[in-house]
Each structure stands twice: as C-alpha cells, then as structure tokens.
Design a protein with these regions (language model features):
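H-loop/switch region of ABC-family ATPase nucleotide-binding domains
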Residues: 209-210
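Catalytic Walker B motif of ABC-type/P-loop ATPase nucleotide-binding domains
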Residues: 174-178
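Helix-to-loop junction immediately C-terminal to a conserved catalytic motif
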Residues: 51
Length: 238
C-alpha cells in the first residue's frame, strides 16, 4: 500500500539543542496514527514541520510518493494536509456556517478559481458550498448549530468546527493537536466518534495526545517519541 505520508530522517535544532533527530516513519491512508511523548519530546515540532509552519534542518517529506519541497502552510494545504491546533483557530464572532464558508474561501485553489468564473457561476458555487457546509456540520455533529456564533460553542464543539473547516478545504490528511485536551469524557467520546466516521470516509488522521489510554484505543498506529527520536512503533498490522 502506498503511504500517504513518508517522513525520512527529519532533524531540527534550536540554539544547538536537538529537538528532532532522524525522525522517520510512514502513515498509511485511511488510518489514525497517535503520537505520544513527554513535553519537549518533539511532537509539536514534528507537526509544525509537516504542516509547513517550521523548516526542518534536514530530511525529506513525501506526500503520496511526491516530495514536498520547501513546504509552507499554503503549499501544504493545497496538497490536502490540514492542521487543527490545540486552541481552535476560528472566528468566534461569526456563525458556525460563516466559519465553514470562510474556510473554503480562504483555500488557495478557491481564490485562484474566482479569477476565471462568471458572476452567475459564483452564485451557483456559493449555493453548492452552503450545501456542503450543511453536510459537514452533520458529519461533525454541529447540525443545528449553523446559525450560532462560534464563540458560544463549547470548547469541544469549537474543535469539531476546526475539523469541519479542514473538510471544507477537502483535506485528506488531518493533523490534530491534543483533540481531547480541555474537554469532558462525553465530548472525548463524541470527538472519537467523529474521527472514526472520517476514517470510514477514507480520511487519514494524525494526532498528538496525552490521553494515551483513549488515543491508543481508537488508533491504528502509535508512535512514541523521546528526546526527538521515534523510539517505538505499535500498530494493528504487526
């Protein structure tokens, strides 16, 4: 099976301190991979590099067998890689629907497309996007919340909205930073159900998580980091 993400010998140092040392792993499509490790083990730095927010000192990234040269947040998003931060990056004064629509308008491909379409086509496209947003709200358990201000949602619902915004951009690889942090047990189960549903649709999920018991129970592969190195890998295929 062709890996959706192939990470080879990634290195990163800050002021002489090695944060990542020859980090190498592959993630298979349609799976959920969990990354564990103590604070400072390199997990977040690794996700920063994959999502284009930080430049590696060395090593290579391959997405669907294609090298990612000089990754930036924009170029990575165009490929179909999306990032959800521990503290959701949403517009709290806008409605859930407007956040979803805004996400699609901010997609690089969407901005380019608007230069080549006629006004009537834009109206039709907007109707199509609204329909898509309604579908995604259902997929992320936010149906019935479309008209509500995003800032009025619970913290867990805001995380689900962030996931929905990636889906509006047709992301196929989702990087989730601590999706279970700051939410209660019921919401953890809720978020887990959404992730399981996305997996069934063929989405691939990578997550950093300190709730090791829950993350291990729903993931296909677990990677353990220590001092910037991937020390162990467990998966259901072993």
């Amino acid at each position: 099976m062709e890996a959706i993400l192939d990470v080879r010998n990634i290195n990163k140092s800050f002021n002489g301190l090695k944060v990542l040392q020859n980090a190498s792993f592959v993630v298979q499509p349609g799976t959920l991979a969990a990354f564990f490790g103590e604070n400072g083990s390199g997990k977040t730095t690794l996700f920063h590099i994959i999502s284009g927010f930080l430049k590696a000192d060395g090593g290579d990234l391959y997405y669907k067998n294609t090298p990612i040269s000089h990754p930036t947040p924009t170029s990575v998003a165009r490929l179909g890689i999306g990032r959800v931060w521990q503290n959701p990056r949403i517009c709290k004064n806008l409605s859930v629907l407007d956040n979803l629509l805004l996400a699609s308008r901010n997609h690089p491909g969407e901005r380019l497309l608007n230069y080549f379409v006629r006004p009537g086509q834009i109206i039709a496209a907007e109707k199509s996007k609204k329909s898509r947003a309604e579908d995604i709200a259902g997929e992320t358990a936010l149906d019935g919340k479309l008209g509500q201000a995003a800032g009025e949602l619970s913290f867990g619902q805001q995380k689900l909205l962030s996931i929905g915004m990636l889906l509006m951009n047709e992301a196929s690889l989702l990087l989730l930073d601590e999706p279970f942090a700051g939410v209660n047990a019921k919401m953890i189960d809720h978020i887990s159900e959404v992730m399981a549903s996305l997996k069934k649709q063929g989405k691939t999920i990578m997550m950093i998580e300190h709730n090791r018991a829950k993350a291990s129970s729903i993931s296909d592969t677990q990677f353990f980091l220590s001092k910037g190195e991937i020390m162990q890998k467990n998966d259901v295929y072993s």
